[in-house]
Amino acid sequence: MKSPDVSLIVNTFQKPRHLALVLASIAIQTGVDGRFELVVADDGSDDVTRRLVTDFARGVPFPVTFTTEPHEGFRLARVRNRGAALAGGDTLLFLDGDSVLPPDHVATHLAARRPGWARIGDVVRLPESVSRDLVPDGLAAIDLQRLAPRSEWQRLRRRHRKSLLQNLLRHPSKPRLAGGNFAVWRHDYLRVNGSDERFRGWGQEDDDLGLRLRGAGIRLASILDRTCTYHVWHPSDPSATPRWRDGVNVPYFLRRGRLTRCRRGLLPRGRNDILWGLPADRTTALSALLAACLVDAPGAEIDQPCEIDVVVWPGKDRFRRRAECRLLLVEEGAREECPSTIRRRADRIESLAGDDENGLLALLEEVG
């Protein structure tokens, strides 16, 4: 059977009423007959959600897949990856299970596809009063555009105009990716190993994915001049914070040495899956232990780029390779002797004893 052009991946958790509205809006998409499939990726809801999706699947002409696993807190990155792993479309259109699609939404995203680009959108936030009155059977007859606050349309227009300027100036981190409405080529999502599952709790997994897509050479363009989705009101997630800098994931997000292909994504990447830049000087106990721990890992030549470049102090090596992460290993007691020129170039500095094999192995499995 021919693969679909696009896989709609809808994440959800314990919001069956909202999900029913989203499913109803997907059922009335126009201009895309036979071109899409739906994957509902659930984060451990009760059986009401499973029954809702099962009943919905019986009445629609497109494939519907449901996946779930036990709930262990807010794990949006993991849920999206589980959905992506089951998707067969050339394009992955990620959607939130609380945001209703306009009838031409999927067709608009398909028409906007370009190699090397991801299309990013946003939501119009519907007021509680409007959200409360929405019912699945009545969506086709409702003009959500008219019911949305004018201030929301003004906000989206400003965001779109800013995104055009940011792309023109080749801004390194903007426009930002909003995970509830974005489309990416499947092979590009695979290139960065999907979403980073080390983000647990609310926030920053979208920003991280956007940065890593850019690191892989993929550009992000706004689609807000063509389409958006409509967010149905609900109370905020308990792990959300009023200020993003107070979020539980912020320290991890702001770390230096981010790898384009994350270590805990669609596939786990152990130390033997990373391209390392290893020191040539192996005369110290710590440098010899490092070589032994990475004996089966791929290594880059001194003039080749790598993912993680490692310098051991004391030692004769310096950071010379082009690398995404620079790791400085300092033997215990020698940190003060390490030149500041080496320390400044390092993204991460760790002090270890020359015989601490367990500590070094643990570090090599998670750095980056």
Describe the role of every protein-language-model region.
Residues 5-7, 37, 208:
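Cell-envelope/extracellular polymer assembly enzymes that use nucleotide-activated donors
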Residues 104-149:
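Conserved donor NDP-sugar-binding/catalytic core segment of glycosyltransferases
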Residues 176-177, 181-193, 200-219, 224-225:
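A short, conserved alpha-helix in the catalytic core of glycosyltransferases
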Residues 24-35:
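Short, acidic, metal-binding catalytic loop of nucleotide-sugar glycosyltransferases
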Residues 42-51, 99, 333-334:
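A conserved acidic beta->alpha catalytic loop
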Residues 70-87:
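Glycine-rich, basic loop-to-helix element that forms the pyrophosphate-binding segment
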Residues 34-47, 65-69:
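Short beta-strand/loop segment that forms part of the nucleotide-sugar
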Residues 92:
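Short aromatic/hydrophobic "clamp" motif used to bind/position activated sugar donors
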